[in-house]
Design a protein with these regions (language model features):
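Bacterial N-terminal signal peptides that target proteins for export
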Residues: 1-9
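Generic extreme N-terminus detector
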Residues: 5, 18-21
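Bacterial N-terminal signal peptides
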Residues: 8-16
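A structural boundary/capping signal
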Residues: 21-215
Length: 215
């Protein structure tokens, strides 16, 4: 993922742990099958990459939402979601932040290449351009099947939370992805994040490297 910094945000005492070591020391809760929406467990720290991104003054970080809890899905809106997911996955070439920017984590809107969080940011921008509310388009951090940090875009709908993923053509409901969901943007304010895991002693201070591998 890319780095995002909101002016005025100060993060102290962050633990530098790899995703694999984090998974080994914490009992994360995986999605329960047939659960339409991911449960939220209070505020948590945003990814450092996102904090840096916001610190560059990106409009993505400024919305104050909470007006719409879920997108009403019709055949038309679902078609738009599928088109955006396919277009971005096809247009953008996968590349790590280290390859592109010579840093471990850097969030930005990609032009022709990017890491997982860049795909998600661009999909969010395109969907907002089609009239979708930012309230339901949520940047999300997960652990993948290899317990590595990964970023996706969650869209909250009346049919459940669905995931737009640069690694997959199919748009799956969150509980069908095989991922462990850690945290995502708040629907109330973009630069606030909420935990998707029950409160744990170190949950609010751990930062997880995201997107060390693009594919």
């Amino acid at each position: 993922m890319r780095n995002v910094a909101k002016a005025g945000l100060v993060i102290l005492g962050l633990a530098a742990m790899s995703a694999s070591s984090l998974a080994a020391t914490s009992n994360f809760v995986r999605p329960v099958a047939n659960t339409l929406r991911a449960a939220e467990f209070g505020k948590t720290l945003p990814p450092i990459g996102y904090v840096d991104f916001c610190g560059r003054g990106e409009d993505e970080c400024k919305f104050h939402g909470g007006k719409i809890e879920a997108q009403n899905v019709t055949s038309e809106t679902w078609g738009q979601i599928e088109q955006v997911n396919k277009y971005v996955n096809t247009k953008i070439r996968p590349a790590t932040d280290m390859e592109l920017y010579h840093v471990a984590d850097y969030w930005t809107y990609p032009v022709d290449a990017g890491d997982c969080e860049d795909y998600a940011l661009l999909k969010k921008r395109y969907l907002q351009g089609l009239g979708f509310s930012a309230d339901v388009l949520l940047m999300t951090v997960v652990l993948d099947e290899n317990n590595e940090g990964h970023a996706v875009l969650t869209i909250s709908t009346n049919k459940g939370d669905y995931v737009l993923d640069n690694r997959r053509r199919e748009i799956l409901r969150w509980d069908e992805t095989g991922y462990t969901f850690l945290k995502r943007q708040s629907q109330i304010q973009a630069n606030q994040w909420v935990s998707l895991q029950p409160v744990q002693p170190q949950a609010s201070t751990i930062q997880i490297p995201v997107g060390t591998k693009s594919k």
